[in-house]
Protein backbone atom coordinates (compact mmCIF):
# COMPACT_ATOMS: atom_id res chain seq x y z
CA UNK A 1 0.00 0.00 0.00
CA UNK A 2 1.35 3.42 -0.97
CA UNK A 3 1.81 6.28 1.47
CA UNK A 4 -0.96 8.89 1.60
CA UNK A 5 -0.21 12.03 -0.42
CA UNK A 6 -1.39 14.30 2.39
CA UNK A 7 1.33 12.89 4.67
CA UNK A 8 4.18 13.60 2.28
CA UNK A 9 7.44 11.65 1.91
CA UNK A 10 9.12 10.17 4.99
CA UNK A 11 12.63 11.28 5.80
CA UNK A 12 14.39 10.88 9.16
CA UNK A 13 14.76 14.17 10.98
CA UNK A 14 18.49 13.73 11.65
CA UNK A 15 19.13 13.05 7.96
CA UNK A 16 17.29 16.11 6.64
CA UNK A 17 19.18 18.28 9.16
CA UNK A 18 22.51 16.93 7.85
CA UNK A 19 21.41 17.48 4.24
CA UNK A 20 20.39 21.09 4.86
CA UNK A 21 23.66 21.85 6.69
CA UNK A 22 25.67 20.29 3.84
CA UNK A 23 23.79 22.43 1.32
CA UNK A 24 24.34 25.60 3.36
CA UNK A 25 28.09 25.01 3.65
CA UNK A 26 28.33 23.64 0.09
CA UNK A 27 30.03 20.59 1.65
CA UNK A 28 30.63 17.63 -0.69
CA UNK A 29 31.87 14.94 1.72
CA UNK A 30 29.54 11.91 2.08
CA UNK A 31 26.78 11.98 4.69
CA UNK A 32 26.71 8.70 6.61
CA UNK A 33 23.28 7.29 7.42
CA UNK A 34 21.67 4.09 8.60
CA UNK A 35 18.25 5.31 7.48
CA UNK A 36 17.50 3.09 4.49
CA UNK A 37 13.78 3.89 4.87
CA UNK A 38 14.13 7.59 4.06
CA UNK A 39 12.85 8.84 0.71
CA UNK A 40 15.11 10.78 -1.66
CA UNK A 41 13.92 14.40 -1.82
CA UNK A 42 15.00 17.20 -4.23
CA UNK A 43 17.18 18.82 -1.53
CA UNK A 44 19.54 15.82 -1.78
CA UNK A 45 20.39 16.24 -5.48
CA UNK A 46 24.13 16.49 -6.04
CA UNK A 47 25.06 15.14 -2.60
CA UNK A 48 26.72 11.82 -1.82
CA UNK A 49 25.01 9.83 0.90
CA UNK A 50 26.71 6.77 2.40
CA UNK A 51 23.89 4.27 3.04
CA UNK A 52 24.55 1.36 5.40
CA UNK A 53 23.93 -2.07 3.87
CA UNK A 54 24.38 -4.07 7.09
CA UNK A 55 28.14 -4.32 6.76
CA UNK A 56 29.59 -1.12 5.27
CA UNK A 57 28.39 2.29 4.12
CA UNK A 58 27.85 2.32 0.35
CA UNK A 59 28.34 5.77 -1.24
CA UNK A 60 25.34 6.79 -3.35
CA UNK A 61 25.48 9.89 -5.57
CA UNK A 62 21.99 11.35 -5.73
CA UNK A 63 20.59 12.53 -9.08
CA UNK A 64 17.15 13.66 -10.23
CA UNK A 65 16.07 10.17 -11.38
CA UNK A 66 16.25 8.90 -7.78
CA UNK A 67 13.64 11.30 -6.36
CA UNK A 68 10.78 9.41 -4.71
CA UNK A 69 12.76 6.20 -4.21
CA UNK A 70 14.06 5.02 -0.85
CA UNK A 71 17.77 5.17 -0.03
CA UNK A 72 17.87 1.44 0.71
CA UNK A 73 17.10 0.64 -2.92
CA UNK A 74 20.55 1.86 -3.92
CA UNK A 75 22.62 -0.08 -1.35
CA UNK A 76 22.45 -3.81 -2.10
CA UNK A 77 22.38 -5.98 1.03
CA UNK A 78 22.88 -9.44 -0.45
CA UNK A 79 25.87 -10.80 -2.34
CA UNK A 80 25.20 -13.36 -5.07
CA UNK A 81 28.04 -15.86 -5.39
CA UNK A 82 26.46 -17.86 -8.24
CA UNK A 83 24.78 -21.23 -8.45
CA UNK A 84 26.90 -24.30 -7.79
CA UNK A 85 25.82 -26.16 -10.94
CA UNK A 86 26.54 -23.40 -13.47
CA UNK A 87 29.79 -24.94 -14.79
CA UNK A 88 28.22 -26.61 -17.85
CA UNK A 89 30.15 -26.39 -21.10
Swiss-Prot record:
InterPro entries reported in the protein's UniProt record: Ribosomal_uS19, Ribosomal_uS19_bac-type, Ribosomal_uS19_CS, Ribosomal_uS19_SF
GO cellular component: cytoplasm; small ribosomal subunit
Biological processes annotated in GO: ribosomal small subunit assembly; translation
Pfam families linked to this entry: Ribosomal_S19 (PF00203)
Gene Ontology MF terms in the entry: rRNA binding; structural constituent of ribosome
Keywords: Ribonucleoprotein, Ribosomal protein, RNA-binding, rRNA-binding
Function: Protein S19 forms a complex with S13 that binds strongly to the 16S ribosomal RNA.
Stored HAMAP family: Ribosomal_uS19 (MF_00531)
Family that this chain belongs to: Belongs to the universal ribosomal protein uS19 family.
The protein's name in its UniProt record: Small ribosomal subunit protein uS19
Species for this entry: Ruthia magnifica subsp. Calyptogena magnifica
Organism ancestry: Bacteria, Pseudomonadati, Pseudomonadota, Gammaproteobacteria, Candidatus Pseudothioglobaceae
Gene this protein is translated from: rpsS
